[in-house]
């Protein structure tokens, strides 16, 4: 049986994959997903079942860096949706991002937290309105343990510099990027492509989409690609 393990990004949760899970399960795939537990859901780190068949990782944004190395290294194929090797690139763009991340970190656990999260999620949704995204439970508050995980992952976001540990060198890779992404800067998008082997990498640039490339059209694209990665 073919398997999928999916990973959401910073300030997300596994419910973002609900339509994706339904689609892949209807096609006979086994589905599991990372849950970091920022909000009310319990954390969960998935693992591959001992089954024959294809092992496909689908990761949105920071999700590529949140997967256990043992999961990533056993993948036959990887789909990166608005992902990156280094979120903060060298140079002026990186300096500006570093300042922004420190500002976000300073808001966590304060009265400024809801506004910071709402601004971040609005940038994720852009060029669409925030209402185009599923309701995010973080806007209703967090437990201290979930906030700490969010803080830890913000540090990871600032310091990741390369493809994550356990990267499967022989895997086929699909990179989907939104040309209007307001979260991942163009330099970081380019660096990801430079870090991947061209002969095994399929790059799709979506001119009308932003950071939240977990749309029905992208789901259709990924399902087609997974049939012949």
Predicted segments, located by residue:
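Conserved alpha/beta-hydrolase catalytic His-Asp/Glu region
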Residues: 111-158
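Short beta-strand/loop motif that positions the catalytic acidic residue
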Residues: 169, 175-177, 181
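Conserved HGGG/HGGXW glycine-rich cap/lid loop of the alpha/beta-hydrolase fold
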Residues: 1-42
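Short alpha-helix in the alpha/beta-hydrolase fold that links the catalytic acid
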Residues: 171, 185-194, 218
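Catalytic histidine-centered segment of alpha/beta-hydrolase-like enzymes
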Residues: 205-220
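Flexible "cap/lid" loop of the alpha/beta hydrolase fold
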Residues: 74-108, 149-153
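Gly/Ala-rich beta-loop-alpha elbow adjacent to hydrolase catalytic centers
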Residues: 58-67
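Acidic catalytic loop of the alpha/beta-hydrolase fold
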Residues: 179-184, 211-212
């Amino acid at each position: 049986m073919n398997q999928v393990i999916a990973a959401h990004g910073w300030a997300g949760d596994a419910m973002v994959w609900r339509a994706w899970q339904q689609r892949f399960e209807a096609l006979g795939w086994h589905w599991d997903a990372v849950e970091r537990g920022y909000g009310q859901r319990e954390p969960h780190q998935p693992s591959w079942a001992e089954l024959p068949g294809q092992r496909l990782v689908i990761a949105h944004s920071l999700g590529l860096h949140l997967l256990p190395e043992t999961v990533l290294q056993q993948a036959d194929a990887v789909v990166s949706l608005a992902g990156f090797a280094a979120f903060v690139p060298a140079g002026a763009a990186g300096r500006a991002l570093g300042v922004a991340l420190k500002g976000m970190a300073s808001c966590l656990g304060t009265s400024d937290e809801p506004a910071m999260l709402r601004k971040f999620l609005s940038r994720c949704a852009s060029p669409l309105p925030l209402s185009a995204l599923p309701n995010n439970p973080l806007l209703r508050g967090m437990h201290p343990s979930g906030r700490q995980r969010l803080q830890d992952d913000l540090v990871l976001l600032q310091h990741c510099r390369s493809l994550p540990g356990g990267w499967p060198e022989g895997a086929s890779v699909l990179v989907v990027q939104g040309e209007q992404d307001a979260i991942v800067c163009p330099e970081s998008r380019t660096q990801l492509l430079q870090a991947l082997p061209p002969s095994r990498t399929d790059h799709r640039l979506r001119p009308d989409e932003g950071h939240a490339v977990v749309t029905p059209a992208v789901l259709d694209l990924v399902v087609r690609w997974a049939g012949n990665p």
